[in-house]
Amino acid sequence: MVIFMTEEQKRKLTGKMKRMLRAKAHHLEPVVWVGKEGSEKVIKEVDRQLKERGLIKVKVRKAALLYEDKYEIAEKLAKACDAEVVSVVGHVITLFRPREGWKKYLAKKPKKKVKKDEKIIELFEKFKKKAVKE
């Protein structure tokens, strides 16, 4: 069975990458505010800020939350601006779009970590073979 992944599915940030981006965004102040009239101007401004900075915070006003959930607003902004939602905390959305392209940030399969016990067993087996030869 062949499964085709869309470009959007391929471009998921790993948990480790999101953690790093949240740390970088900690000191940032919101640069865009979304009000009750979320319009094309807001999307254009978010897009412009992402081109300039790469990582931004967007503040969602209470009036905007009367019509939509903050998570829906975050997803709509991310989709419209070809970005990824890093976090949604309170009324602040953190968005990320790399300036140099997505290739560097594509989700990769994690490498298999060898447990310490397995390493010790391997070393013991090697030592045992050497001892038998001598």
Swiss-Prot record:
Statement: the UniProt record of this protein carries the keyword Membrane: no
SUPFAM superfamilies with a match to the protein in the record: YhbY-like
Entries under SMART domains matching the protein: CRS1_YhbY (SM01103)
Domain of life: Archaea
Keyword Oxidoreductase: no
Example of a GO MF term: RNA binding
InterPro entries for the chain: RNA-binding_CRM, RNA-binding_domain, RNA-binding_YhbY, YhbY-like_sf
UniProt keyword annotations, A-Z: RNA-binding
Ranges for domain CRM: 11-108
PANTHER family: RNA-BINDING PROTEIN YHBY
Annotated protein name in UniProt: Probable RNA-binding protein MJ0652
The organism of origin for this protein: Methanocaldococcus jannaschii (strain ATCC 43067 / DSM 2661 / JAL-1 / JCM 10045 / NBRC 100440)
